[in-house]
């Protein structure tokens, strides 16, 4: 298990110049938090966020995967109750979505949904079945309507939406 990354070198129809790497949880081989991967997304800064069985791994320089440099993923370190720990290290991350402000909406298998700052350090919102209309703490997917900021949470008990404040601005002003 793990994650396979393919570089088709700009010629997807010519496999003779392709290269690939298998990323695992070993140091020097990807450094994922876990080899069971549930979600992969690219944020607005080009960083790759990977949701696993045990938290989140971030590739800050994804081009380094094929350059031979140190390409291991990093974890987000946060302070909680005076302790330094990895962001959602004990959670199965089912989905990560990026809104128009580059914030991360994170779906977990047992703790509801989180909204964190663009760097992942600050928790902005935490929705659970106990503190919100969220139908279940098992959030299996999140989708964002970028034109109006509406966030859709798919749970094992149904879908509910939330009107967020971050949208993508597509109209050009001259």
What are these regions (language model features)?
Residues 1-174:
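Carboxylate-rich, polar loop motifs that coordinate divalent cations or form catalytic acidic clusters
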């Amino acid at each position: 298990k793990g994650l396979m990354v393919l570089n088709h070198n700009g010629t997807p129809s010519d496999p003779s110049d392709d290269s690939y790497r298998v990323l695992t949880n070993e140091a020097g081989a990807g450094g994922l938090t876990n080899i069971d991967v549930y979600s992969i997304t690219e944020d607005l800064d080009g960083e790759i966020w990977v949701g696993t069985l045990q938290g989140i791994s971030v590739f800050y320089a994804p081009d380094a995967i094929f350059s031979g440099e140190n390409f291991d993923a990093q974890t987000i370190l946060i302070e909680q109750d005076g302790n330094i720990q990895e962001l959602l290290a004990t959670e199965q991350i089912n989905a990560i979505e990026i809104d128009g402000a580059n914030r991360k909406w994170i779906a977990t298998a047992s703790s509801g949904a989180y909204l964190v700052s663009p760097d992942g350090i600050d928790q902005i919102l935490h929705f659970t079945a106990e503190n919100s209309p969220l139908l279940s703490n098992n959030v299996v997917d999140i989708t964002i309507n970028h034109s109006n900021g509406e966030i859709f949470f798919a749970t094992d008990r149904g879908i509910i939406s939330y009107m967020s404040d971050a949208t993508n601005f597509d109209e050009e002003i001259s």
